[in-house]
Amino acid sequence: MASRTNTSSYKRMFGGERPAMVRSTYSSRQYSSPVRTTSRVSYSSASSASPSIYMSKGARVRSSGPLPRLATETLDFGLADAINTEFKTNRTNEKAEMQHLNDRFASYIDKVRFLEQQNKILIAELEQMRGKGSSRVGDLYQDEMRELRRQVDQLTNEKATVEVDRDNLGEDIERLKEKLQEEMLQREDAENTLRGFRQDVDNASLARLHLETKVESLQEEIAFLKKLHDEELAELQIQIQEQHVQIDMEVAKPDLTAALKDVRQQYETLASRNLQESEEWYKSKFADLSEAAARNNEAIRLAKQEANDYRRQLQSLTCDLEALKGTNESLERQLREMEDNFSMEASGYQDTIARLEDDIRNMKDEMARHLREYQDLLNVKMALDIEIATYRKLLEGEESRITTPFPNLSSLTLRETMKETRPAMDSLSKKVVIKTIETRDGHIINESSQNDDLE
């Protein structure tokens, strides 16, 4: 006899081994000898620890106790905020796929019930066929079990496909979030540039006001200098006219006293001396006035030149101011357009965020419902597996009792069975599978599995 352990999705889903089957073959008949196996399945996570499930299979299974229930991890759906809007487009497809899986599982349950009826029929046939030789009940049972295992594997593959689609949707969500962050950064850069332009406009306005004030002060100073120069010229002209009149009067007086020649001569001498002094004073005064006029003319020329320079600077600044006004108007227009665009984009992003939040809430509810349904299905499947194991043990017990009417072969069968069963019993042990998952902010940061064999 050969001991074989089938490894399939059963192990991946429930973390345990399939019950070992030990076959004893004699001539053309096949008999299944039950081997007692014990398996323990335990799941644990970083956030919560769920109770373990202990299931013992032996030659007899008592059905009076409550059915074991598979423990599931306590899921924190608040960590699933990373799921994005792409789920909405695939939600209907996933729902249809889950409904299809539910229908297939319902058909699987119907088939199991049908197998129960077939088992009853086979038990009746076994009662009739006792003493008539071996039957192909074991082969039929194995064929049905292989078919059921194939269906379970197919369901597992479909489940893996759905999980891959879910991971792809998560990647799309991350890509959209990165794009949203880039758009927000571009908007901040544009706002910073706009603030810089506003500062430049303010500085240009202050410079223009300062230059206008300076031009006004220079114009007032030029007007004051002109007025002062005109007043000085008027005073000089008045002084020159008074001196001419005085000189004429002093020269004419000697002409009135024809009788007094001596006095005339004295006055003539005095007049000539006064005239000479007046001429010298006039020349010196005229030189001073000419020098002052030259200085004033130079000052006026410099003032005019400076005024012309200021006028040119004023014109240049006026042109710059007009250009800055045009630039300011253009920037303000661009600012209004950008604000309108950003407001529309922000409203669109807000709508997208609201839609994403609605989709996330819906997906959370949908995931919770699917998990509850999956838990119920796992519980039903566990109960069905226990019932199938019970019926299998009953069938094996019936087959083992068929061998009792053959006294000549009993010792040989017993020896072969014991010989093949002992190594299988020695190799079987209690296995504990501990799976630990640590999550943070909705992301799995650590996942580990530990297998412990209990002798």
From Swiss-Prot:
Per UniProt, residues of the IF rod domain are: 94-402
Gene Ontology molecular functions: structural constituent of cytoskeleton
* Stretches assigned to coiled coil: 87-122, 145-236, 294-398
Keywords from the UniProt entry: Coiled coil, Cytoplasm, Cytoskeleton, Intermediate filament, Nucleus
Pfam families, A to Z: Filament (PF00038), Filament_head (PF04732)
* Region of interest called Coil 1B, as start-end residue ranges on this chain: 145-236
Q: Where is this region: Linker 12?
A: 237-259
Site Stutter: give positions. F342
Q: Where is this region: Coil 1A?
A: 88-122
**Record note on quaternary structure:** Homomer assembled from elementary dimers.
What family name appears in the similarity comment? Answer: Belongs to the intermediate filament family.
Q: What is this protein called?
A: Vimentin
Q: Which organism is it from?
A: Cyprinus carpio (Common carp)
